[in-house]
Amino acid sequence: MHPEEDWLAQVPVGGDAKRNLVASEISGDGDVDAVLADCDEVLEHAYHMRSFNQAMMETFRTYTELDRYGRLHVISSTQIVFHVRRILSRALGIPKSKIRVEKPRIGGGFGAKQTAVSEVYPAFVTLKTGRPAQLIFTREESQIAGSPRHEMEVRVRLGADKDGHIRGLDLYTLSNSGAYGEHGPTTVGLSGHKSIPLYTGGLEAFRFGYDVVYTNTMAAGAYRGYGATQGIFALETSVNELAEKLGIDPTIIREKNMLREGMKMPA
């Protein structure tokens, strides 16, 4: 995965055929470049986090039936009952009021079950036949149909004075959404929105930008940490490298720069 100059997709991967960009944004506060130019120490590194899949104990599974009122009753191992109802309504062409989704206690999810995976197939059978239907995925099927963590490349520019006070942060994330982009625009935001505020203590300026791209790979989705994990790993590693370069205990660096009562967190 790498940025392409014009975001031109070489093969059909959905979305806008003229580019493979799912989402893009730049936000911040202050003149980051000027602050970094005035810092005693500036670190610039890129960190690559690979994609990998969940393995919750209970695989994807759904049972469907028509209740006494003729409504579609869906019992599913899911984390998103109302999203499932909305998705089934659109997929099957029936009103949401005709669908009831029930979530029993599930055997793990870690975010994988924040995607509608097994619900539509038995629901379609029940609507066509009027009979109950059930679908239970094997472990192999769950791995194939699941949604792994987003592969990300996070580039960090960090500026500080010689005493370890972090004055400027510039963070850019390139996120691989895979063939579809349902969680792409939301997970990537957390890579910066959950990491940069940790170092608000003496921060004079910050910038956070991201691009999310379609690629011809498995569609990524929710995975424990939901994008924050990748961003925090990158920034925390940079802070450790700053501490080593300055010869200051990493804990002291964090104490000097942590958010304190009364401060406003950048968002």
Where on the chain are the PLM-derived regions?
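Structural alpha/beta core scaffold segments of enzyme domains
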Residues: 1-267
